[in-house]
Each structure stands twice: as C-alpha cells, then as structure tokens.
C-alpha cells in the first residue's frame, strides 16, 4: 500500500499551481509516483492532500483521496491516512512517500521492503552536503533518529540525509504516528519523529541508501530543472540499453510513458510528448515532435515533422516538413514534403484517414474530415476537401499557364 503526501503548499516554487502538479517529463510529480506505484500492484494507493488539490485530483482512477483538513505537518497527514485507508490490516506493508520525490525507483522501494523483516520501519538515506535535508543519525548500523539540519550543531560537510520515504508494517506505523507530539515552535507533527519514538520503544529501525539524484526533493524551480535533467538522463540510458540508437542523446527529450522498439534510430533534437509508442526499426528524423501518437515498425518520420494524436502504419514515410494531426495512416504510404493535415475548423478537431500504399504529393493540404482510401495518389500541391476513392489519382491545382513577358 502507498501513502503519498501531497498537502504541502510549495511556497518556494512561486506558483499558483500546487507543487506536486509541476511536471517532469511532461507528467506531474504526483503522476510519476502513482505511475511507479502501480507497477508494484499495491492493494491501495492513497493521496493525502488539502481540499483545493483534492478537487483537482478527482479525475484520478483507482486512487483513494484523503483530505488533510488543516496543514499540521507530515505526521498528521500520515495519521489521517492510516485512520481512513480502506481495507487496511496490521500485516499490510505501507510505503510512505513525499509527493515531491518523483525519481525514487521501484527497485529501491523493493530493496526497502526486503530490509523490513525484523524491523518496525525502514527509511531511505543518501549522501549529500546540502543542509536543506534532514540528517539520519546512525549508531551501530541502526537508524536512531532523524534531525533537522539546523538543529544539528555537529553536522559534517557531507552527511547521510533523509530522502523522505519510509516503509513500515501498518500495525507499527499506526501505533507510532499516534505517539507523535506537536512541535512547540511550528505547531506541526513531524513524521520523522517516529524513528526516535520507535527506538525508545525498543523497536529496530533500518535504512537503505541511494544516490542524491534519485532522492532529489523538489522545493524550487531550480530543483525542478535538476530533476528534469536527471529524469532525461535516466531515460536516455534506459533506451540505449534497450537497443535504441540515440545519435545525440543529450538532444532527445522523453516523456514518462514513451515507448520505443528495438533497433529504432532517433536523430538529434527530437521531442516526445505524452502517449508516444514507436515500433521496432523506426527512424525519427531531426527536429521532430510527436505526441499521443503510435508509429509502426520500420516507419520513417521527420525531419521537421509534427505528429499529434495520430497512428502511423508500418513502413510508412513522412519525411519532411509536415504536420500530421488526428490522422490514421495505413501501411507503406508516403506523405510528401510540406503536407499539412488541416484538422481544426476553429471550433473542434476532425479525423483524417489515409489508407495503405497511398502517395500524397508534396505541399498538399488535406482538409478534415477526410478519407483517402488505399492505393490512392494525390498530386503535389493539391488541396483535398472530399474523400478520395480507392486507387484513384486526384489533382486539384490549376493548369499551369505560360505567358511571354513584355
């Protein structure tokens, strides 16, 4: 089970948008955590948030939304969650994660769960010199306390910091959060206090370590930019390790859900928005942007092509300076340079269907809604406003005139 803490205001972001809704890889921080959590098939994913954010999250499917009525700190948020989570039993393992730590990997969470045996809870730490993070106090191989850095007079240049994620059995978590006392200076309840509470109750507390990049907590726009950089670097490595060629990896940008098949080649300066799936052996040329689009095996898209809300068939070529929107293109078709699908009439968008083995000549405009059937040919420079029957040639440009210059 997951408890995601998302009630913080994020004042340092200087934004009207709640902090956890700021995006990395075209998905919000909260979406990253939920996306990863779902890969682990938990019985319950609960998000604790304030009322205004709850209203914005009601579109989320299969997520339990829990309102923290007053912003009384992370300890109060978890206490509210365990009191309200559905079908919670003592033996359930609960992962508590802050909503501003979107880069935590499932392999790390799995390692923490494995470390939980014989312990009340397990925390995650990382080495850093950044004094904004709380510090893990380790004695004889066990975690004894988490302290805020400003309260720690003996802090070293580099220390083991708190990454803001805990794993515990529901029974232990429920009992420990009930013992958290209100901080006298801030009037908040700190979740980190449960470590010292557990130790005083003669319970073992474990810890696992990771690197600072994975544990990045996002509190400012600068942190957001760093997290975007780390995310993109990780995705580039993932795809190259998966058999995808990135000609200039640092110039290619991915979304959280981008899928690319083996032996595809991605050329420089390509941007993948949400919802892109690319089959094996495809080629995506320079300066191409794709969003909500499926590209078939062996297809070639770009350079300077934008494809949006479209399905592009196997071995189809859309090679130069084209816009393909709300369009389905069949197999082995060729879309010539400068082709534009005119899908928006000023009020709503319309679909275009281009069949298999079609040829669309350069500088053509296709006015949706439109159907171009299999094996049709559209002559260069045509403006197509009516459906094209199967195996037909269509020419709409005027006859060329040649006149003598006086």
From Swiss-Prot:
UniProt organism field: Wolbachia sp. subsp. Brugia malayi (strain TRS)
User: Region Pyrophosphorylase: what ranges?
Assistant: 1-221
Which protein family is named in the record? In the N-terminal section; belongs to the N-acetylglucosamine-1-phosphate uridyltransferase family. In the C-terminal section; belongs to the transferase hexapeptide repeat family.
Name-wise, this protein is Bifunctional protein GlmU
User: GO biological process: any one?
Assistant: lipid A biosynthetic process
Q: Which GO terms describe its molecular function?
A: glucosamine-1-phosphate N-acetyltransferase activity; magnesium ion binding; UDP-N-acetylglucosamine diphosphorylase activity
Residues annotated as binding UDP-N-acetyl-alpha-D-glucosamine: 5-8, 19, 68, 73-74, 98-100, 134, 148, 162, 219, 308, 323, 334
Q: Cofactors per UniProt?
A: Mg(2+)
Q: How is the cofactor bound?
A: Binds 1 Mg(2+) ion per subunit.
Q: Where does Mg(2+) bind?
A: 100, 219
Q: Region N-acetyltransferase: start and end of each range? A: 243-406
| Gene that produces this protein | glmU
The record's annotation in Pfam families points to: Hexapep, Hexapep_2, NTP_transf_3
Q: How does it assemble?
A: Homotrimer.
Annotated acetyl-CoA binding lies at 337, 343-344, 380, 397
What cellular-component terms does GO give this entry? cytoplasm; membrane
Question: Could you tell me which HAMAP family the record lists for this protein?
Answer: GlmU
């Amino acid at each position: 089970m997951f408890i995601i803490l998302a009630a913080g205001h994020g004042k340092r972001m200087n934004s009207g948008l709640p902090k956890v809704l700021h995006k990395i890889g075209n998905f919000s921080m909260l979406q990253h955590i939920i996306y990863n959590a779902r890969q682990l098939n938990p019985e319950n994913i609960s998000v604790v948030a304030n009322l205004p954010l709850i209203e914005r999250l009601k579109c989320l499917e299969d997520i339990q939304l829990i309102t923290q009525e007053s912003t009384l700190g992370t300890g109060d948020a978890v206490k509210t969650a365990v009191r309200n989570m559905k079908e919670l039993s003592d033996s359930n393992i609960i992962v508590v994660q802050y909503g501003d730590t979107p880069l935590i990997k499932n392999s790390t969470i799995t390692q923490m769960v494995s470390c939980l045996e014989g312990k009340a809870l397990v925390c995650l730490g990382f080495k850093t010199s950044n004094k904004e993070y709380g510090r893990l106090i380790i004695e004889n191989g066990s975690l004894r306390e988490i302290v805020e850095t400003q309260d720690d007079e003996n802090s070293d240049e580099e220390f083991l910091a708190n990454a803001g994620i805990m794993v515990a059995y529901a029974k232990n978590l429920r009992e420990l959060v009930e013992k958290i006392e209100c901080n006298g200076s801030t009037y908040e309840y700190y979740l980190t206090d449960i470590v010292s509470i557990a130790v005083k109750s003669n319970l073992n507390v474990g810890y696992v370590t990771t690197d600072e990049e994975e544990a990045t907590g996002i509190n400012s726009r600068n942190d957001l930019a760093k997290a975007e950089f780390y995310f993109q670097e990780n995705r580039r490595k993932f795809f190259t390790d998966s058999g995808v060629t990135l000609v200039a990896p640092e110039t290619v940008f991915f979304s959280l859900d981008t899928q690319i098949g083996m032996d595809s080649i991605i050329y420089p300066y390509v941007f993948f928005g949400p919802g892109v799936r690319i089959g094996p052996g495809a080629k995506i040329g320079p300066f191409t942007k794709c969003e909500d689009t499926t590209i078939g095996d062996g297809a070639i898209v770009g350079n300077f092509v934008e494809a949006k809300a479209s399905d592009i068939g196997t071995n189809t070529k859309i090679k130069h300076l084209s816009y393909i929107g709300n369009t389905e293109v069949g197999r082995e078709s060729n879309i010539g340079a400068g082709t534009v699908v005119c899908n928006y009439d000023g009020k709503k968008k319309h679909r275009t269907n281009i069949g298999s083995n079609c040829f669309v000549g350069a500088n053509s405009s296709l006015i949706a809604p439109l159907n171009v059937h299999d094996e049709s040919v559209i002559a260069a420079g045509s403006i197509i406003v009516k459906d094209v029957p199967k195996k037909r040639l269509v020419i709409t440009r005027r006859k060329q005139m040649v006149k003598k210059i006086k």
